[in-house]
Amino acid sequence: MLTDILKKIFGSQNERILKRIAPLVDEINSYEPVMRKLSDAALKAKTPEFKQRIANGEPLDDLLPEAFAVAREGAVRTLGMRPFDVQMIGGIVLHEGMIAEMKTGEGKTLVAVMPIYLNALTGRGVHLVTVNDYLARRDSEWMGQVYKFLGLSVGCIVHGLDDPERKEAYGADVTYGTNNEYGFDYLRDNMKFRIEDMVQRELNYAIVDEVDSILIDEARTPLIISGPAEKSTALYYNINRIIPQLKPETHYTKEEKSRTVALTEDGVTRTEKLLGVDNLYDPRQIDILHHVQQALRAHVLFKRDVDYIVKDGKVIIVDEFTGRLMPGRRYSEGLHQALEAKENVHIENENQTLASITFQNYFRMFDKLAGMTGTAETEAAEFAKIYKLEVVVIPTHRKMIREDYADCIYRTEAEKFRAVAEEIKEAYAVKRPVLVGTVNIAKSEKLSGILKRQGVPHQVLNAKHHEKEAEIVALAGQPGAVTISTNMAGRGTDIVLGPGVVDVGGLHIIGTERHEARRIDNQLRGRSGRQGDPGSSRFYLSLEDDLMRIFAADRLSGLMQRIGMKEDEPIEHRLITKAIENAQSKVEAQNFSIRKQLLEYDDVMNQQREVIYRQRREALQGENLKPVVLDMIEDLLEGILAETADEKHYAEDWDLEKINSEVLRLFGLQMNLTVESLGDIEYEEFRDSLLERLTKRYEAREQEFGESMMRELESYLLLQTVDTYWKDHLLNMDHLKEGIGLRGYGQQDPLIAYKREGHALFDEMIERIKEETIRLLFHIQIQREEQLDELRKEQEDQPMFFGPAEGAGQKPQTRKDRKVGRNDPCPCGSGKKYKKCCGK
């Protein structure tokens, strides 16, 4: 009530932003006659002039009106397209680091040109992020004409480019590419062994196209680079063989909401008998139990042609949001191998995580982030909370006149599809184009089969036919066109109405199921009614749809019985519509909670990732690691003495045997210390003499290898050790996260426990990195300098896989190594105490 009163007095936040921007648009328009009179050469000369003004300290905001006017004139001269005033508003919103919500067909691609041009003038680079390679390539070529005309360089990052090509594309003023390519390049860069091999530059400014799809839908799946872990494939086949002999409810229970399957007590007994194992919960068999559960998930929860397809003898994941295939992406924790065993195709080795990051944390690293989409308002709270991004709804250029009809609800899926086919036939009879949205490949092919039998010509657009995606979508507005599309495949391609289509009512949209998120339903509707065109939309639902069955079944079944539904008879009832909306709100809240939790846990990893990547980069950039190595030697000696000697006592009380063995193990130095040889030496003198001998040993190694080779060796060994232990640490953190939820039963906050124990694991890893680097440095035998290059090449050429494949493999062995003390020098070599540096 109060909110409504305040809105009437002050206007909504959205209205206030638009009111503030309006004078800027007038100022841009005032430059238009001036720009129009300029010759091509004079217009192009504006770019170096702007760059000079920026170098002289003029802020971008002061340049905005004139720069936007130049970019607009550039678009007119190269593309023959003049951005409307509402597109200028969208451009200003993007420049200010907000999300511009613009309806389908309002020209989002062109909107980005103005803020990209302005921000690229700084020379620090601008990233435009799209959902697929096709759009990245298309937009970089199409809009690239404007930038090139105005004297800026354009790069495009797509799958299949080699490193030099990627580096060149990232070095351009404007870079187009997909979220996956950007994220994986960031991870790959932080696995490189030479600074000059890195391809990305600083993360300055990014505009994310289809921002809801990238920052919300895909945020639940972290980007992961993994490498092969040793495991026998026979295990997967053996376990797969027994799964059909387990019965639902008797031997296992499933929870579709959380996508989990659990063995019952009878199930455990039956599995032990079938596999010939005494006790599945024996620590030595825990690995088998894990793989039984993954095989159950593969058989019970993952459906062929819905979650994955089998193509050319490979199991390929289908993106649940876009319906596109994701070749090269693999499920983690042995699930992908379980699916391969289920489908009886070749099992590829299990993978272990080498590097991982979430989209949330990758995009939050940009100095400035903005986005655009047709549907963001329903998720405005999430954008504000996680990314600190405000959503601004941009007015349409022409009034929207599409008609959205009420949902039609049927009892069964078969009845629903019959009704959908009937409506398609009616539209086809009058040559009215229809776009039908389905939730997965299986449903689109089922509907396609019905239409074939009824003699209705149509096109199917799903992950199996993605090559023709843009072409099929572009023709979806032609007279009599019938297009069946999974989810939001084809986003970014305009559906232009063909001749005579306006007269028969424009493009008609049919949704065959409600999506988990209202936003996705709105995206489907938004394909019709672009730029004031006529159009309509209707959703057909059944009580057998996943959303209804899982989230609204209890309320709806009783309601339906009271209403009394008959076969092939639809029902429209406000209570049912309300129940559906409640179900969608429930799922949206659940998904937001999952994403928020993922981020909270990844934030712990993110702090550790930043420390490791920063140290790696310093090691790559550092001309001389000698001071760092000498500090490590001193730290390790302090660690040995802390456990074996006491400054208050004399040699007869010290553990000289352990000092001898540890110095030999780590530094390769035979000490042969005895109580007799040490006499009455005091602790300080003893420590200093030991350090002096170790320093001399180090200098002898340096003389043996030569100064230049020693520096190379130090850099290589530190990087190689960091990578090895970071990989193991990721695996440890994965296993910690898996079991941490159970702490809730012990009245512990799982997140706090994860932070505390994750930090302890990180401390332990840092100590092990120091130990291993020094041990290798004092023991390694290098005959010639080329050996180092060969070792480095071998390390760089390790096989990698990209996708949702978090670490798997054997549980790590726990070690009782000494942890880095809070007051110890920081292992990164900064010279500060650990608690003041990496241990913060």
From Swiss-Prot:
Q: Which reaction does it catalyse?
A: ATP + H2O + cellular proteinSide 1 = ADP + phosphate + cellular proteinSide 2
Kindly give the SMART domains that the UniProt entry links to this protein.
SecA_DEAD, SecA_PP_bind
InterPro entries according to UniProt: Helicase_ATP-bd (IPR014001), Helicase_C-like (IPR001650), P-loop_NTPase (IPR027417), SEC_C_motif (IPR004027), SecA (IPR000185), SecA_CS (IPR020937), SecA_DEAD (IPR011115), SecA_motor_DEAD (IPR014018)
Report residues binding Zn(2+): C826, C828, C837, C838
| GO term, biological process aspect, one | intracellular protein transmembrane transport
EC number(s) from the headed UniProt entry: 7.4.2.8
* A Pfam family hit: P-loop_SecA
Q: Which residues cross the membrane?
A: none
User: Which top EC class applies here?
Assistant: translocase
Co-factor binding details: May bind 1 zinc ion per subunit.
Places the protein is found? Cell inner membrane; Cytoplasm
UniProt superkingdom: Bacteria
Q: Which Gene3D superfamilies match?
A: Helical scaffold and wing domains of SecA, P-loop containing nucleotide triphosphate hydrolases, SecA, preprotein cross-linking domain
Where are the annotated segments for Disordered?
791-840
Question: Topology relative to the membrane, per the entry?
Answer: Peripheral membrane protein
Any GO MF annotation of the entry = metal ion binding
Cofactor(s) listed in the protein's UniProt record: Zn(2+)
Keywords from UniProt, A to Z, are:
ATP-binding, Cell inner membrane, Cell membrane, Cytoplasm, Membrane, Metal-binding, Nucleotide-binding, Protein transport, Translocase, Translocation, Transport, Zinc
List, alphabetically, the PANTHER family matched: CHLOROPLAST PROTEIN-TRANSPORTING ATPASE, SECA INNER MEMBRANE COMPONENT OF SEC PROTEIN SECRETION SYSTEM
Per its UniProt record, what HAMAP family does this chain match?
A: SecA
Q: What does this protein do?
A: Part of the Sec protein translocase complex. Interacts with the SecYEG preprotein conducting channel. Has a central role in coupling the hydrolysis of ATP to the transfer of proteins into and across the cell membrane, serving as an ATP-driven molecular motor driving the stepwise translocation of polypeptide chains across the membrane.
What quaternary arrangement does the UniProt entry report?
Monomer and homodimer. Part of the essential Sec protein translocation apparatus which comprises SecA, SecYEG and auxiliary proteins SecDF-YajC and YidC.
The UniProt similarity line reads: Belongs to the SecA family.
Return the NCBIfam families for the record. PRK09200.1 (NF006630), PRK12904.1 (NF009538), secA (TIGR00963)
Q: What is this protein called?
A: Protein translocase subunit SecA
